[in-house]
C-alpha cells in the first residue's frame, strides 16, 4: 500500500509541467568521432562560452524544458541534446549551469581529476530541509574534511571485504523468505503460477535487507501481516523522492516561504524518515547498553559503528538515516528492471540459471563460494544498470581548470556525466538496445573502459555499493533457482524520472516454479 494520496511508484507523474512530444528512448550515433578532443591537444583550448549551448538565459531554458520535454523525461532531454550538440554541451536551467559529457574518455579525465574530497551536486530541497530544520547530515550532504572523516569510518564497516562477508547470511535469509512469499502465492493461486506487479514486495524486501544488515534484526516486512511502521517508512522514502523533483530547478526556499503544498508534501515524509530512523537507532543503542554484548556473532553495521568510537552518536544517526533512506527504492528498482530484462530475454535467463545451478553444486551450497562462481550473473547486474541506471547523471564540481573536448572548463564548474544517454549510445556500446551481459566479460578493456558507472566512481562512489551488489546477486541466485520469470507484454514499458529512474507503468510478471530435479534427470 502506498501512502494516501500518492500515485503508484511505477506510474508517470507529470505534476505541473506539460509533457509534449516525448522523444523515443533510442539514441542515434554521435555525429562527431569521439577521438576528437577527448585526449591531449596541442591547440590552445577554446573558451568556456563557446561550448555548444541552447542559450544563457536559464529561466527561458527552463520554460522550454518544462514545455517541450517535462521534468519526468529529463533523461530523454539529455539524449536529444547530445544528438544536437554531440559529445559536450552546456546548459543553464534556472540558476544552475552544467557542462554535460557522454564520452568515456571525457568521463575518465573528469574523475581522474576529482581530488581527494570530491563534491557533487546536492539536491536543493534536501539541503534546504536540513538547514531550515537543523537536521544533522551524513556523507550524502557533507563536504571536504567533514565528509572525509565520516566516509573513512563508514568504508571500514560498509565497503571493506573483510566486513562485507558478514552480510551474506543476513541477506540470504531475507532472499529465501522472499522466495517463500512467492511460493505461497503460487499455491494460493491454484493455477501453477502467480502473476502480478511485485514492485511493493520488492520495496519491502529491500527495506528488510538493509535493516537486517544495519541492525542485525528483522522487521517483519515479508510476513503475512506487514509491519505498519516499516511500511510507513517505505512510503515516506518514495514520497521524499517524488516531491523533490519539482524543486530541483527552482529555489526551494521560495516553496517554503510561501508555504506551498509542494514544500509541505516534501517536509512530511522527511519528518517521518528522521523520526523512524532515530527511533530504530536509539532503541538499538538503548538495548545494547542494557544487555551488553552477549552475542559472539556479527550483529550488524550499527553495532560496529557504536563500538568503534570514531564517530559521534549524532553522526552515526545521521549516516544510518541516509543508508536506510538510500537502500530501498534504489535497490528494489534495479531488481525490478533486472527481472523485466530476464523475462524479455528468456535465453539469457536460461544461461544465468545454468550458471547459478552449476555454482551451487560446485560450492556445495556455500554462498561465499557461489558468489565467486557467477561472473555472468554479476555482469547481468552491470548490464541492467547500463540500460536502467538509478541516477540520470553523475556529477562533480571541478577542483581545477580542466580541458574537455578542447574547451577550457573553469574550476568550480558543475560537470555532469549523462549515464542514461551513455548507456544507450551505439558509439560506445554495440547494439545498445540488446540486453547482453556477456559484453561485460570481454577482456578488451576498450569495451568496458569507464562505462560501468551504475554506482558512480572513485572515493565518492555509492556508499552502499557492496551491500547492494551482494543483496541483488543473492536475491537473483535464489530467484533463478526457484522460478522461471515471464512477462506478457514484451514492448518497452518506458522510463520516468522521479529523482531516480523508474518504470513508466506497472510491470506484471508471471512466476513459474522451477523444478531443479527435473533438469538433473
UniProtKB/Swiss-Prot annotation:
Record's bilayer topology term: Peripheral membrane protein
Gene3D superfamilies documented for this protein: Cytochrome P450
Domain of life: Eukaryota
This protein's UniProt keywords: Cholesterol metabolism, Heme, Iron, Lipid metabolism, Membrane, Metal-binding, Mitochondrion, Mitochondrion inner membrane, Monooxygenase, Oxidoreductase, Steroid metabolism, Steroidogenesis, Sterol metabolism, Transit peptide
Binding site for heme: 462
Location relative to the cell: Mitochondrion inner membrane
One of the Pfam families matching this protein, by short name: p450
Entry GO CC: mitochondrial inner membrane
EC class (word): oxidoreductase
Residue stretch of the organelle transit peptide: 1-39
MF term (GO), any: heme binding
Cofactor(s) essential for the protein: heme
InterPro entries: CYP11_CYP27_families (IPR050479), Cyt_P450 (IPR001128), Cyt_P450_CS (IPR017972), Cyt_P450_E_grp-I (IPR002401), Cyt_P450_sf (IPR036396)
EC number(s) per entry: 1.14.15.6
Pathway listed: Lipid metabolism; C21-steroid hormone metabolism; Steroid metabolism; cholesterol metabolism
Family membership noted in the UniProt record: Belongs to the cytochrome P450 family.
PANTHER family per UniProt: CHOLESTEROL SIDE-CHAIN CLEAVAGE ENZYME, MITOCHONDRIAL, CYTOCHROME P450
Function: A cytochrome P450 monooxygenase that catalyzes the side-chain hydroxylation and cleavage of cholesterol to pregnenolone, the precursor of most steroid hormones. Catalyzes three sequential oxidation reactions of cholesterol, namely the hydroxylation at C22 followed with the hydroxylation at C20 to yield 20R,22R-hydroxycholesterol that is further cleaved between C20 and C22 to yield the C21-steroid pregnenolone and 4-methylpentanal. Mechanistically, uses molecular oxygen inserting one oxygen atom into a substrate and reducing the second into a water molecule.
Name of the protein described by the UniProt record: Cholesterol side-chain cleavage enzyme, mitochondrial
Gene designation per UniProt: CYP11A1
Amino acid at each position: 500500500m502506498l501512502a494516501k494520496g500518492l500515485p503508484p511508484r511505477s506510474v508517470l507523474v507529470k505534476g505541473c509541467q506539460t509533457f509534449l512530444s516525448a522523444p523515443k528512448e533510442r539514441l542515434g550515433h554521435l555525429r562527431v568521432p569521439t577521438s576528437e578532443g577527448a585526449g591531449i591537444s596541442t591547440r590552445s583550448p577554446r573558451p568556456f562560452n563557446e561550448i555548444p549551448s541552447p542559450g544563457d538565459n536559464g529561466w527561458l531554458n527552463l520554460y522550454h524544458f518544462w514545455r517541450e520535454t517535462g521534468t519526468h523525461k529529463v533523461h530523454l532531454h539529455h539524449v536529444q541534446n547530445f544528438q544536437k550538440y554531440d559529445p559536450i554541451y552546456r546548459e543553464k536551467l534556472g540558476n544552475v549551469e552544467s557542462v554535460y559529457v557522454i564520452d568515456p574518455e571525457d568521463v575518465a579525465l573528469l574523475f581522474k581529476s576529482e581530488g581527494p574530497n570530491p563534491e557533487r551536486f546536492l539536491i536543493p530541497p534536501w539541503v534546504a530541509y536540513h538547514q531550515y530544520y537543523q537536521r544533522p547530515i551524513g556523507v550524502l550532504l557533507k563536504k571536504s574534511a567533514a565528509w572525509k572523516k565520516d566516509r573513512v569510518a563508514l568504508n571500514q564497516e560498509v565497503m571493506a571485504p573483510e566486513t562485507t562477508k558478514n552480510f551474506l547470511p543476513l541477506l540470504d535469509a531475507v532472499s529465501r523468505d522472499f522466495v517463500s512469499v512467492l511460493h505461497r502465492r503460487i499455491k494460493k493461486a491454484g493455477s501453477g503460477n502467480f502473476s502480478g506487479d511485485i514492485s511493493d514486495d520488492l520495496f519491502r524486501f529491500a527495506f528488510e535487507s538493509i535493516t537486517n544488515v544495519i541492525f542485525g534484526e528483522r522487521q517483519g516486512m515479508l510476513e503475512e501481516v506487514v509491519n505498519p511502521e516499516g511500511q510507513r517508512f517505505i512510503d515516506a522514502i518514495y514520497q521524499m523522492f517524488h516531491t523533490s523533483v519539482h524543486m530541483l530547478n527552482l529555489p526551494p526556499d521560495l516553496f517554503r516561504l510561501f508555504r506551498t503544498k509542494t514544500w509541505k508534501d516534501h517536509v512530511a515524509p522527511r519528518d517521518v524518515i528522521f523520526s523512524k530512523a532515530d527511533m530504530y537507532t536509539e532503541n538499538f543503542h538503548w538495548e545494547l547498553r542494557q544487555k551488553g554484548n552477549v552475542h559472539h556473532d556479527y550483529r550488524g553495521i550499527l553495532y560496529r559503528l557504536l563500538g568503534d568510537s570514531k564517530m559521534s552518536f549524532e553522526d552515526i544517526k545521521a549516516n544510518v538515516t541516509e543508508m536506510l533512506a538510500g537502500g530501498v527504492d534504489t535497490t528494489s528498482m534495479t531488481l525490478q528492471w533486472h527481472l523485466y530484462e530476464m523475462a524479455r530475454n528468456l535465453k539469457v535467463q536460461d544461461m544465468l540459471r545454468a550458471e547459478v545451478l552449476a555454482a551451487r553444486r560446485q560450492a556445495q551450497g556455500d554462498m561465499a563460494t557461489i558468489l565467486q562462481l557467477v561472473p555472468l550473473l554479476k555482469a547481468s547486474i552491470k548490464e541492467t544498470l547500463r540500460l536502467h541506471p538509478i541516477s540520470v547523471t553523475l556529477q562533480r564540481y571541478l577542483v581545477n581548470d580542466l580541458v574537455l573536448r578542447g574547451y577550457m572548463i573553469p574550476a568550480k564548474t558543475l560537470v555532469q556525466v549523462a549515464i542514461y544517454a551513455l548507456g544507450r549510445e551505439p558509439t560506445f556500446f554495440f547494439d545498445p538496445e540488446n540486453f547482453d551481459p556477456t559484453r561485460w566479460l570481454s577482456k578488451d578493456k576498450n569495451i568496458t573502459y569507464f562505462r560501468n558507472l551504475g554506482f558512480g566512481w572513485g572515493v565518492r562512489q555509492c556508499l552502499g555499493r557492496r551491500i547492494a551488489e551482494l543483496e541483488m546477486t543473492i536475491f537473483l541466485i535464489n530467484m533463478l533457482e526457484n522460478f522461471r520469470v515471464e512477462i506478457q507484454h514484451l514492448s518497452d514499458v518506458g522510463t520516468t524520472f522521479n529523482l531516480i529512474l523508474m518504470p513508466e507503468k506497472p510491470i506484471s510478471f508471471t512466476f513459474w516454479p522451477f523444478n531443479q530435479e527435473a533438469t538433473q534427470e
